[in-house]
Amino acid sequence: GGSNALNSFMSLMSGEKGDYFATHPLLTEALSGCEDSCDVIGLNYLTGRHVLEHELHPHKAVLGTETYPADIVRLWRIVEENPHMIGDFTWAGYDYLGEAGCGIFHYDGGANFSSIYPERTAYIGDLDLLGNRRPISYLREIVYGLRKAPYLAVLRMEHNGQTSSK
């Protein structure tokens, strides 16, 4: 229960499930009062709503205020193709202590946010605690058009043929 249940729910909110939730009429109704009073509409984890917001509020800018790092390919395409989109802030650029293991890929059916001792970091940032780049940072660099050279990331052999939690 509590925050772990909410975090587990949020980890499901990407792809088609996330888009269904993001564009549901009940959410549109719930957000309308707040959005009507803002000049810029900031959305956390609602990438599927970015284009819809322009249809609902054609004179307002939209910003991804928190998004999943692995959604960058899809998200950046939306930003580039829609002038009302002014950018994106991913969660999180730098890894941090707390929410232990929320960025770890599980191959045993385990859910995100179900850390195993001795995990301490979220393991989700583009940079680790020491400032070293993690593989997702290279993907972001490629998506932004800042890197032309290939980057090779390798799946550990013990997980060959297994499906990950993300």
Regions picked out by a protein language model, each given a short descriptive name:
Residues 1-166:
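Extended substrate-binding grooves/exosites of carbohydrate-active enzymes
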